């Protein structure tokens, strides 16, 4: 459908077009892709891994202040893809929800419950005229004592689901295709990290430097969400280069 034939339906979040589309929600997905960041996440064996690009857009920016990985609780981490201001707002909301859950019930909020709650909030943003959908997508990883490693994703439409492997961002179709071909269910932590790096490197057609990628990991042996430092990333990049 042409731009002109939308007949004003793109101006209102709460009104469906005759074709059953919510244009403002679709535009939120486009905002995510326009940030030109790709994120991949996977769970395998006893670990879950998330990897995303790190882009420092100006020379005068302090690199340590640029990140797309955030800790929600001690054991739940996330990668945010899309508009960074919207991303930080959603992370803050997730932290509040997790803290409130712990205060009310006395134990940590499970990752699937947290993702469902964030998705529910996102869905409300699609039906209230005074709000706009957030231009970001959240990928959560955690190690759950009952269900093992977990990867969950939610988006501006309020959809959420658990995944064995998933991607978000500019090259999501290519990354999903790569993961479908290469994914194995019983990878070690090292192999899972290297698969995530190789996936991003392949679909983006670039050779990463340690300061150009961020990686978060949780595992059965260390369920605390941990962000790898540049030295650890360099070790994995070296091993990938040696295999090639």
From Swiss-Prot:
Q: What is the protein's major site of localization? A: cytoplasm
Q: Does the keyword Nucleus apply?
A: yes
Q: Which UniProt keywords apply?
A: Cytoplasm, Nucleus, Proteasome
Concerning InterPro entries, the annotation shows: Ntn_hydrolases_N, Proteasome_alpha, Proteasome_alpha-type, Proteasome_asu_N, Proteasome_sua/b, Proteasome_subunit_alpha6
Q: Where in the cell is it found?
A: Cytoplasm; Nucleus
Task: Write down the superkingdom of origin.
Answer: Eukaryota
Any one annotated GO CC term: nucleoplasm
Could you confirm whether the keyword Cytoplasm appears in this record?
yes
- One BP term from GO: proteasome-mediated ubiquitin-dependent protein catabolic process
Which SMART domains does the record associate with it? Proteasome_A_N
**Protein's job:** The proteasome is a multicatalytic proteinase complex which is characterized by its ability to cleave peptides with Arg, Phe, Tyr, Leu, and Glu adjacent to the leaving group at neutral or slightly basic pH. The proteasome has an ATP-dependent proteolytic activity.
**How the protein assembles, per its UniProt entry?**
The 26S proteasome consists of a 20S proteasome core and two 19S regulatory subunits. The 20S proteasome core is composed of 28 subunits that are arranged in four stacked rings, resulting in a barrel-shaped structure. The two end rings are each formed by seven alpha subunits, and the two central rings are each formed by seven beta subunits. The catalytic chamber with the active sites is on the inside of the barrel. Interacts with PI31.
Give the record's family classification.
Belongs to the peptidase T1A family.
This protein is called Proteasome subunit alpha type-6
Primary gene name: Prosalpha1
């Amino acid at each position: 459908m042409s731009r002109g034939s939308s007949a004003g339906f793109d101006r209102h979040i709460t009104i469906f077009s005759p074709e059953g589309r919510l244009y403002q929600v679709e535009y939120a997905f486009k905002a995510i892709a326009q940030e030109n960041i790709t994120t991949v996440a996977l769970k395998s064996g006893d670990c879950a891994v998330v990897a995303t690009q790190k882009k420092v857009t100006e020379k005068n920016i302090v690199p340590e202040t640029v990140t797309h990985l955030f800790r929600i609780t001690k054991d739940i981490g996330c990668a945010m893809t899309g508009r960074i201001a919207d991303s930080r707002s959603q992370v803050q909301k997730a932290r509040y929800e997790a803290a409130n859950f712990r205060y009310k019930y006395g134990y940590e909020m499970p990752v699937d419950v947290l993702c469902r709650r964030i998705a529910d909030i996102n869905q409300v943003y699609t039906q209230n005229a005074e709000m706009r959908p957030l231009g970001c997508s959240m990928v959560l990883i955690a190690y759950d004592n009952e269900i093992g490693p977990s990867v969950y994703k939610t988006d501006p439409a309020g959809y959420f689901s658990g995944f064995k492997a998933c991607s978000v961002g500019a090259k999501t179709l290519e990354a999903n295709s790569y993961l479908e071909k290469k994914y194995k269910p019983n990878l070690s932590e090292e192999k899972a990290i290297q698969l995530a790096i190789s996936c991003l490197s392949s679909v983006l057609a670039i050779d990463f430097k340690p300061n150009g990628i961020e990686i978060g990991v949780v595992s059965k042996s260390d369920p605390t969400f941990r962000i790898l430092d540049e030295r650890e990333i360099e070790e994995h990049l070296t091993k990938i280069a040696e295999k090639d």
